[in-house]
């Protein structure tokens, strides 16, 4: 079975073709970073219009890369939510339309389930069950995963997502958009210990998180100090250290609560080198294992949607002829695969 996956939930247009025997056959990705750079963030209307322009050409490119035609495709998977409603509707409309034209089933995919299952694309996929840390610009949550669709949210951010806090703090520091990766790069030049940021909500029980206070703490620290390059690097180091430490503390608690020793980290922030190092150290300390996707599959992409869609189609799930987008869609509302 071959599935084409379409991802248009925010500011990346991703198309991929996945074969249940051969694995990933093609992967096309277009980022709208340059389009939104002048605005310092994603402009939903511009994102939607650009998806309209790019999705069909990328579908053609993905087919060409895999040396396939539409007749070789057995199903179409598209991101139906959560995300920007206009951007979602572009992918959903195109996905549902080409499925109808090609005479194959279509299946809506949950964006965060796609991220959660992205490590399954690797040569050493994680076996169930495990604890998943889904950490991106729009979501930060800890999920107990017993199987595909068997999700229990253990905790989540009550305000800003971790990736959002990275980007907003980077903007406060005068870094270009998107600032999160640039802040992490700047942090590599920072001096450990010069600044000490708090670890929010780690002094109380529970697995919920909060990152808006770190952004405020960073703003106050920036105002109170010189704006030379080394000071900015030291602040970036302290901020990243606090975010990573907070996430690792929560992961450790989640593993204790569930009795598990396997953790999956996925989403855009899962590409953060410091976070990976600290989670690997945690796993080694407890005799556990940590899994994450390759860097190109940490950000939004069509490969994760194609894979997740494959699992749903095999379970007999399909979409009707109507087009739906669900900008808010809790992951624990998904049906388990039987």
From Swiss-Prot:
The entry's keywords: Acyltransferase, Cytoplasm, Iron, Metal-binding, Transferase, tRNA processing
Binding site residues for Fe cation: 111, 115, 300
Cofactor, how bound (note): Binds 1 Fe(2+) ion per subunit.
GO molecular function, one term: N(6)-L-threonylcarbamoyladenine synthase activity
Pfam family, one: TsaD
Cysteine disulfide links: none
RNA-binding as UniProt keyword: no
Binding site for substrate: 134-138, 167, 180, 272
EC class name: transferase
Catalyzed chemical reaction(s): L-threonylcarbamoyladenylate + adenosine(37) in tRNA = N(6)-L-threonylcarbamoyladenosine(37) in tRNA + AMP + H(+)
Record-linked Gene3D superfamilies: 3.30.420.40
InterPro entries: ATPase_NBD, Gcp-like_dom, KAE1/TsaD, Peptidase_M22_CS, TsaD
Domain of life the protein comes from: Bacteria
GO biological process: tRNA threonylcarbamoyladenosine modification
Protein role: Required for the formation of a threonylcarbamoyl group on adenosine at position 37 (t(6)A37) in tRNAs that read codons beginning with adenine. Is involved in the transfer of the threonylcarbamoyl moiety of threonylcarbamoyl-AMP (TC-AMP) to the N6 group of A37, together with TsaE and TsaB. TsaD likely plays a direct catalytic role in this reaction.
Protein name per Swiss-Prot or TrEMBL: tRNA N6-adenosine threonylcarbamoyltransferase
Organism: Vibrio atlanticus (strain LGP32)
Organism lineage: Bacteria, Pseudomonadati, Pseudomonadota, Gammaproteobacteria, Vibrionales
């Amino acid at each position: 079975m071959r599935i084409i996956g379409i991802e248009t939930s925010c500011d990346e247009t991703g198309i991929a073709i996945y074969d249940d025997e051969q694995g990933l056959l093609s992967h096309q990705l277009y980022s709208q970073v340059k389009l939104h750079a002048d605005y310092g963030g994603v402009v939903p209307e511009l994102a939607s219009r650009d998806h309209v322009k790019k999705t069909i050409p990328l579908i053609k490119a993905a087919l060409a890369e895999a040396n396939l035609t539409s007749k070789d495709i057995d199903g179409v998977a598209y991101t139906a939510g959560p995300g920007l409603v206009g951007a979602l509707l572009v992918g959903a409309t195109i996905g549902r339309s080409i499925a109808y034209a090609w005479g194959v089933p279509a299946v809506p995919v949950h964006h965060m389930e796609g991220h959660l299952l992205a490590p399954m694309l690797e040569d050493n996929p994680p076996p169930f069950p495990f604890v998943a840390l889904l950490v991106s610009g729009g979501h930060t949550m800890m999920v107990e995963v017993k199987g595909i669709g068997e999700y229990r949210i253990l905790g989540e951010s009550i305000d800003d997502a971790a990736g959002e806090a990275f980007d907003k703090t980077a903007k406060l520091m005068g870094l270009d958009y998107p600032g999160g990766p640039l802040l992490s790069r700047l942090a590599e030049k920072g001096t450990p210990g010069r600044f000490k940021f708090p670890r929010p909500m780690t002094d109380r029980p529970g697995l919920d998180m909060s990152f808006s206070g770190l952004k405020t703490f960073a703003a106050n620290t920036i105002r109170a100090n010189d704006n030379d390059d080394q000071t900015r690097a030291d602040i970036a180091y302290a901020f990243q250290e606090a975010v990573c430490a907070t996430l690792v503390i929560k992961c450790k608690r989640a593993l204790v609560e569930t009795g598990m020793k396997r953790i999956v980290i996925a989403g855009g922030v899962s590409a953060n080198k410091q976070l990976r190092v600290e989670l690997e150290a945690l796993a080694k300390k407890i005799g556990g294992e940590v899994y994450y996707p390759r860097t190109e599959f940490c950000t939004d992409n069509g490969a994760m949607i194609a894979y997740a869609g494959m699992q749903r189609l095999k379970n007999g799930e399909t979409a009707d002829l109507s087009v739906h987008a669900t900008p808010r869609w809790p992951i624990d509302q998904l049906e388990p695969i039987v």
